Amino acid sequence: MKSHSHSPLDSSTAHRQSAVLGWALKGILVLLLSYAIGWVLEQYQWATYQFPQTVLWCSVPYAITSYWLYNGAYLPQFEERRFLLVATAAPYLAAPLGFALLQQPYSRGAVLLVYLLSAAWFTLGHWRERGRYALSLAYLDSSVPMRLKELLGDASELSQQDIKLRPLAIPAASDAAPKVTDDTSALAGVVIDPQAPTDAVRERLISDLRLQHVRLYSVEAVAELISGRKMLSNLQAQDLWALDGNPAYDTVKRLTDIGLTLAALPLWLPLCLAAGLAVKLNTPGPMLFSQIRIGRNGREFRIWKLRSMRHEEATTARFAQPNDDRVTSVGKIIRRTRLDELPQLWNVLKGDMSLIGPRPEQAEFVRVFAHRIPAYPYRHLVRPGLTGWAQVQQGYAEGEEQTAVKLSYDLYYVAHYSLALDLLIAYKTARILFTGFGAR
């Protein structure tokens, strides 16, 4: 389920979705091959009758993988391989739980076989599609390279992601009826600069490209695809007005939040109590720390955390710093491992927060940032979360400049939040828990 806001990359997304769907349908041969292997193994009594039956059941995780890859076709270029890993592995890792709930006997070997074959199939499809279309762009306006550098802050991001950008071959200016002479069949699209001056010749070239069914992208759209951020410096009012959320997915997301939080209760509640006891024994003061934060639709709510600072310092509204002297010895550990966030699962159950979304900010800071950064309030269109796109991409933000960068990630999430993006964030959060990235 994808956001309903209209993206300037809709045509690219549609192309990638079409490619995923076609490749997934061809991949049914993978299931047939797995079934044939299982049948042969059963005939020679090298496997039980459960093997081919399990292969048939594995059409469910195969379909889930296909749907997730289809749903994630709009994700930033640099996240494609990570999401491919998540989308191909997670359904098969969850398969034993599904068999247990259904009380259905199954073959672990069959699950492993179908997973390996389907993962190889979708990986092959990814590299095939990427080699054919994904990385070759031409630009019509000479200002495009400079604009990309301004928006991204580092032109090397193009080369780091193997994105080829070259000028579009155009006819001589004396041609009364100019036509594009470039071989556009090998291009993923043509980039134009909406701020570039226009004339009759440029308009005819653009119309010629459209008649050839060439995809046209604004320079801002390409920057967004590369960086996974909304470009605040070029964000127009109508772009913000289009951020209308994703009501259908909101319901699924809320039910998932409640279900996962309750299912994990036997794990996180004892862990929270143990960490809280360590906080209490380490320094004088309460176990918990609360603060007013701003949530969905700008509503205030009280957030709960395990106290990680000295009690007399904890209520001060200021950004945490590297090696902050207010943080206790136990506080450093629970911050690095994110254990201090566990009480917020109560906020998730209450509906103040979601498991995934922009991090809720202190009310004092929100008032300041909303005054200085006009687009800031739009991050409150969705529920705040325990972890979010800005957290896994940027880490902790301090000061107005880093907050603006954080906002660009948050607005990207608001515009595109979906099951695919939430799965990617969950995967990256799990990795971060082992590294301590972004902890202060």
Predicted regions and their residues:
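N-terminal hydrophobic signal-anchor/signal peptide
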Residues: 2-31, 122-266
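Signature of alpha-helical transmembrane segments in polytopic membrane proteins
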Residues: 1-128
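Hydrophobic alpha-helical transmembrane segments and immediately flanking/interface helices
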Residues: 116-132, 331-337, 346
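Short, glycine-rich, amphipathic interfacial segments at transmembrane boundaries or analogous
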Residues: 223-224, 229-231, 288-329, 386-406
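A short, structured surface patch at a secondary-structure boundary
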Residues: 322-383, 425-433
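Phosphate/oxyanion-binding loops and surfaces in catalytic or ligand/nucleic-acid-binding neighborhoods
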Residues: 212, 284, 309, 372, ...
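C-terminal terminal-structure detector
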Residues: 2-10, 377-440
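A hydrophobic, helix-centered structural microdomain
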Residues: 249-313, 347, 419, 424-440
